[in-house]
UniProtKB/Swiss-Prot annotation:
ATP binds at G17, P18, T19, A20, S21, G22, K23, G24, T25. This is Cytidylate kinase. It comes from Ralstonia pickettii (strain 12J). The gene is cmk. The lineage of its organism: Bacteria, Pseudomonadati, Pseudomonadota, Betaproteobacteria, Burkholderiales. It is found in: Cytoplasm. Its EC number is 2.7.4.25.
Length: 231
């Protein structure tokens, strides 16, 4: 067990990966099964994106974006998210909001403004955090770091099914193009680029079911906890 992990008051599992890799669904199920709190860090960026779009703020207006990030009036409950008292759970899933979130996430000042808010999610008995830099930046001391990937085709098909089920129009081809563009932007940004932590366990979920991925992550967590107790 590392010194940093030993210093954590409660265990943290981070699940990072690109858009539509399934990390959110997996994180939600892991948190439910372990009775841990859940941090969907992507929702925070989407909230900043949605709020900025409603105020007609350009994604290069860093000062205004930081203000929004610091002043977010947000409430999480179960699988619902409220912004200024309005349930925006469905609005946050729109592709335009996701693209805006990816664009503003390149700004270090915005990420810094959300950092303390993300760290505050760590409470007893533990936390499952999903995002793009949970294991590399926000919780580098996590007891288990998972980097979940999948092919662009598999991710586009998953996202297509999700959007159609929620009443949005989309095509697999357009979604594939959007995913490739967002992947490139996330991987090449100068601040907290999308990459696996050095000690992350990588898992390609292209040909796996959600249950199979959840089972693998739980197995890794039990292995880590068993090793920590042995030490």
């Amino acid at each position: 067990m590392s010194d940093t992990a030993a210093s954590m008051p409660y265990p943290v599992i981070t699940i990072d990966g690109p858009t539509a890799s399934g990390k959110g669904t997996v994180a939600h199920q892991i948190a439910d099964l372990l009775g841990f709190h859940l941090l969907d860090s992507g929702s925070l960026y989407r909230l900043v994106a949605l709020a900025s779009m409603r105020e007609n703020i350009d994604d290069h207006d860093v000062e205004s974006l930081v203000r929004i990030a610091r002043e977010l009036d947000v409430r999480f409950k179960a699988d619902r998210i409220w912004l200024k008292g309005e349930d925006v759970s469905l609005a946050l899933r729109h592709e335009s909001v996701g693209n805006q979130a990816s664009a503003i996430a390149v700004h270090g000042a915005v990420r810094e403004a959300l950092h303390a808010r993300q760290r505050a999610f760590l409470e007893a008995p533990g936390l499952v955090a999903d995002g793009r830099d949970m294991g590399t930046v926000v919780f580098p001391e996590a007891v288990l770091k998972v980097f979940l990937t999948a092919s662009v085709q598999a991710r586009a098909e998953r996202r297509y099914k999700q959007l159609i089920a929620k009443g949005f129009s989309a095509t697999v081809e357009s979604l594939s193009q959007d995913l490739e563009a967002r992947d490139l932007r996330d991987r090449t940004r100068s601040v907290a680029p999308l990459r696996p932590a050095q000690d992350a366990r990588q898992l390609d979920s292209s040909d796996m079911t959600v249950d199979e991925v959840v089972a693998q992550v739980l197995d890794w967590y039990r292995q880590v906890q068993g090793a920590n107790k042995a030490n």
